[in-house]
């Protein structure tokens, strides 16, 4: 069995199919792992979600910020923008089933035997594996409740949850986990999150900011960390234990697939624009 990890698809369904053809992906034998942000901006978020849902146990995804934003739009908590490119998905007959499927997806997944962890944006350097499991499980539990829109989604939008507080309770605790695992790029030297800078490290002019993965972390030493979210990196992190897979397909660049067992990246150029 092969494990394939794909970067932010964001509705680029044709490119996803093309890159899977290149490796002869067989869902009866192989697994497709996705770093989240299956939807938004690209031309066919509906087909993308339907495809991943149809794969059953052969697909393993985590939630990204755009996936959570889709829940907010569907729940009438946010309005969709033209740039979201979600109208066909929101009007689909099976939208409720697709949202329910998304709600079952976690913020982190792991392959313990490979010492591999996958999240959308990364892992806070302060966190141990036990903390990562615990905090992501709290968010997953909240998403599966009937009142998830009121109790979680309606309250998750804030830039104030930028600092890890181990004693925090309720929504404050969940907010930090969502921010860290789905939105994080840079940290200040004291460890709190910065949400403004999205440039690659070589273009960041604030001396107080460093990419999250440059801080000392027990998980960075022991595990391979697979993530997406940060298209400006274009996969360039110069560390064999970091797999940055968002390479900007929805922005006209390419989609990246990583074959775990061969430690090989396969790419597909963007074929059409939304």
From Swiss-Prot:
Species of provenance: Shewanella putrefaciens (strain CN-32 / ATCC BAA-453)
Protein name per UniProt: Bis(5'-nucleosyl)-tetraphosphatase, symmetrical
Phylogenetic placement of the source organism: Bacteria, Pseudomonadati, Pseudomonadota, Gammaproteobacteria, Alteromonadales
GO cellular component, one term: cytoplasm
Database matches in InterPro entries: Ap4A_hydrolase (IPR050126), ApaH (IPR004617), Calcineurin-like_PHP_ApaH (IPR004843), Metallo-depent_PP-like (IPR029052)
UniProt entry tagged with the keyword Nucleus: no
GO molecular function: bis(5'-nucleosyl)-tetraphosphatase (symmetrical) activity; phosphatase activity
GO biological process, one term: RNA decapping
Manganese recorded as keyword: no
Enzyme class: hydrolase
Cited PANTHER family: BIS(5'-NUCLEOSYL)-TETRAPHOSPHATASE [SYMMETRICAL] (PTHR42850:SF11), METALLOPHOSPHOESTERASE (PTHR42850)
């Amino acid at each position: 069995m092969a494990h394939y990890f794909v970067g932010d698809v964001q509705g680029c369904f044709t490119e996803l199919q093309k890159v899977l053809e290149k490796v002869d992906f067989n869902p009866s034998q192989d697994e497709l792992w996705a770093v989240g942000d299956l939807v938004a901006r690209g031309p066919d978020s509906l087909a993308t979600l339907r495809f991943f849902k149809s794969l059953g146990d052969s697909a393993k995804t985590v939630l990204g910020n755009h996936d959570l934003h889709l829940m907010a739009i569907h729940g009438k908590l946010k309005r969709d923008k033209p740039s979201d490119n979600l109208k066909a998905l929101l009007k689909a007959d099976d939208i409720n089933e697709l949202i329910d499927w998304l709600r079952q997806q976690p913020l982190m997944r792991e392959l313990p035997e490979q010492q591999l962890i996958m999240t959308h944006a990364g892992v806070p350097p302060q966190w141990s594996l036990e903390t990562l499991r615990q905090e992501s499980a709290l968010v997953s539990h909240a998403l599966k409740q009937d009142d998830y829109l009121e109790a979680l989604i309606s309250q998750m939008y804030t830039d104030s949850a930028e600092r890890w507080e181990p004693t925090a309770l309720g929504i404050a605790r969940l907010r930090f986990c969502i921010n860290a695992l789905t939105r994080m790029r840079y940290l200040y030297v004291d460890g709190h999150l910065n949400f403004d800078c999205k440039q690659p490290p070589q273009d960041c002019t604030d001396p107080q900011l460093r990419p999250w993965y440059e801080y000392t972390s027990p998980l960075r030493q022991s595990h391979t960390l697979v993530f997406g979210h940060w298209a400006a990196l274009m996969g360039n992190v110069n560390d064999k234990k970091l797999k940055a897979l968002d390479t900007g397909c929805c922005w006209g660049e390419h989609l990246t697939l990583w074959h775990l067992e061969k430690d090989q990246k396969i790419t597909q150029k963007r074929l059409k624009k939304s």
